[in-house]
Amino acid sequence: MDISVFSIQKSRADSFENEIKEYIKMSAKFANISDKIIFNDKIAKAQSIGKDEALKAYDEAYEPNLKGFCVMLDERGSELNSSEFAKIFEQNMQLSFFIGGAYGLSKNLKDKAQKVISLSKMTMAHKIAKLVLFEQIFRGLCINANHPYHK
């Protein structure tokens, strides 16, 4: 199983990088997981202009990566418990998760996804959402493997 997590962020260095690497390492016995950070001059310029331009730049950056079962993270997406989230992994061998940039994700991009989910009704920093997503991916894989991590 291949799982890719795509995020738009300025740099790889953040306060949760070590924790994310640890979840990737722990998940390796279940799946090949990659953390794909996307940021370029076009995104930087578009974000400084405004929301519409930024969303268009995010679309252009993400669309070539729409492979396998695509899951978008959005505050208005469906909320799942950990067992429901784990079911996503049962029938899909290639999954791609997408975390929006400062302006979220466009309707156009969300419409191309097989699933749109929310991690919480609360608003949280993107780096926290990303850490929670990696933990839930590990938890979901453990649930499906009957691993004791999820009790």
UniProtKB/Swiss-Prot annotation:
Its EC number is 2.1.1.177. GO terms for cellular component: cytoplasm. Homodimer. It holds the Pfam family SPOUT_MTase. The lineage of its organism: Bacteria, Pseudomonadati, Campylobacterota, Epsilonproteobacteria, Campylobacterales. Belongs to the RNA methyltransferase RlmH family. The keyword Transferase applies. Keywords: Cytoplasm, Methyltransferase, rRNA processing, S-adenosyl-L-methionine, Transferase. GO terms for molecular function: rRNA (pseudouridine-N3-)-methyltransferase activity. It comes from the Bacteria. This is Ribosomal RNA large subunit methyltransferase H. It catalyses: pseudouridine(1915) in 23S rRNA + S-adenosyl-L-methionine = N(3)-methylpseudouridine(1915) in 23S rRNA + S-adenosyl-L-homocysteine + H(+). It is found in: Cytoplasm. It comes from Campylobacter curvus (strain 525.92).
